[in-house]
Regions:
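Compositionally biased, proline/threonine/alanine/serine-rich low-complexity intrinsically disordered stretches
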Residues: 1-63, 72, 226-247, 379-382, ...
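Extracytoplasmic ligand/sensor domains, especially the bilobed periplasmic-binding protein
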Residues: 121-216, 289-291
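Signal peptide-proximal N-terminal region
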Residues: 79-98
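Glycine- and acidic-residue-enriched helix-capping/strand-helix junction motifs
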Residues: 69-81, 194-196
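Structural motif
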Residues: 95-114, 169-172, 221-246
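Segments of small-molecule ligand-sensing domains
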Residues: 325-394, 411-412
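Extracellular/periplasmic periplasmic-binding protein-like sensory domains
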Residues: 273-342, 356
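Extracellular/periplasmic bilobed ligand-binding domains
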Residues: 137-141, 184, 197-306
Length: 412
């Protein structure tokens, strides 16, 4: 067997604290974060490395993220920041070691094995679907492992999946609309792969509820195709007024018990909304919410119902209040990944303590989190656009919050 050069010592990575000037009003400031070490070694070629005996094995939580991949580094950094924000509030927890010197497409399994050899008691990651698929193909997963994406697989006993699949939001929308006694749905979808996934998930859930899909519209950017689509003739419109002073009889009436589901991004939702009757119930996913900074632009979305995570819609929700926000401004998409990191840390603590059965559902910052067939599924909360701002339509719940299990505290 070829000899392998000894690994250089891990390099300490200093976390960035939350500052009073940058933190949102009411948000707690992060206490000093635990030391994070990032395994760095020469890697001239992307190939699996043999695992050698490690004389400095230290029990830790391994965080596998593609921080140096130009395509995923921004997302990985947001997840890491949220994960470490949660870790900073648990001084009794295991230290976190970040692993980023790998390619999720080629050698994520080798990096996973290296983390185990280095003493990882639990692993969080990988992040991409390809990386998760590669790990899911492994027959043996020796420690509790939380992959940050979902794939169709029959995983080993210790492997669990947790991500932000938009499909789940589409199913939640179907349930919300059904509870409003809406029985007919018109689906407007663009041709992007994500839009098609949203459409399929919504229609599947809607049909399982015994409700009707009355029309599907492929939207290609021309809103004029929507003219008159959601109305039926009003027979009273053809009758003459009793007196000249009578108010005019409307020409059209909105089809009763009908809703619209927008399987689109925010730009197309803005194009479509003016062509829909104001009182026609209209629903979408978090794809249409990019934050409340631009209320003037958001006016185009007034009246649209959607779902998103408490982290963005319920700032007074107890779990949201507990955790510090990023010291640097983040986009709405980055905030969602930051929140994913927070809940990932909370879930891995439950996995380490073997308390999943008694601790779920978790009142997470990403939503209510439950476990089904090795997949942590989250239920988003409902929101609506009003006066150019998105706001929650559900009051925050106040359950007792156990951030971290006492069973996992390190004893002096």
């Amino acid at each position: 067997m070829a000899q392998h050069a000894a690994k250089p010592a891990p390099v300490t990575v200093a976390p960035v604290p939350v500052t009073p000037e940058s933190a949102p009003v009411g948000a707690p400031l992060a206490p000093p974060e635990p030391t994070v070490t990032q395994a760095i070694e020469p890697q001239p070629q992307l190939e699996e490395r043999a695992i050698t005996a490690n004389e400095n094995v230290v029990p830790h939580i391994a965080l596998l993220l593609p921080l140096e991949d130009k395509n995923f580094s921004e997302a990985a950094q947001a997840v890491r920041a949220g994960f470490m924000a949660a870790a900073s509030l648990n001084p009794f927890g295991l230290p976190v070691q970040v692993y980023s010197k790998f390619d999720e497409n080629l050698n994520v399994v080798a990096e996973y094995r290296q983390a185990i050899a280095n003493g990882a008691q639990a692993v969080v990651g990988p992040l991409t679907r390809k990386g998760v698929s590669a790990l899911a193909a492994e027959q043996v997963i020796p420690v509790p492992t939380l992959a940050l994406n979902t794939v169709d697989a029959h995983p080993a006993e210790n492997l669990f999946f947790f991500g932000l699949p938009a499909d789940d939001e589409a199913r939640t929308v179907a349930e919300l609309a059904a509870r409003k006694n809406l029985h007919n749905a018109v689906v407007i979808a663009t041709t992007s792969p994500l839009a098609q996934r949203l459409q399929f998930a919504f229609e599947e859930a809607w049909s399982k509820l015994g409700l009707n899909i009355v029309r599907e519209i492929d939207f290609k950017g021309e809103p004029s195709v929507l003219n008159g689509l959601f109305t039926i003739p009003n027979p009273a419109a053809s009758k003459p007024s009793a007196t000249p002073d009578d108010p005019p009889v409307p020409d059209v009436l909105v089809i009763p018990d009908t809703m619209v589901f927008l399987a689109t991004d925010v730009e197309n939702a803005r194009r479509i909304r003016p062509y829909l009757p104001a009182k026609l119930p209209t629903y979408a996913t978090s794809q249409i919410f990019k934050g409340n900074d631009d209320t003037l632009t958001n006016y185009d979305l007034n009246g649209i119902h959607f779902v998103d995570m408490p982290w963005l819609l319920q700032p007074d929700n107890p779990p949201v209040v507990v955790y510090p926000h990023s010291a640097t401004p983040l986009s709405a998409d980055q905030e969602r990944l930051y929140a994913l990191g927070i809940d990932a840390y909370r879930l891995v603590q439950l996995m380490l303590a073997h308390t999943l059965a008694v601790s779920l559902p978790l009142d997470g910052v990403t939503g209510q989190v439950q476990l089904s067939n090795h997949i942590f599924q989250r239920t988003a909360v409902a929101g609506v656009f009003s006066q150019g701002r998105a706001q929650s339509t559900a009051s925050a719940t106040t359950p007792a919050i156990q951030m971290f299990p006492d069973q996992f505290k390190n004893q002096p």
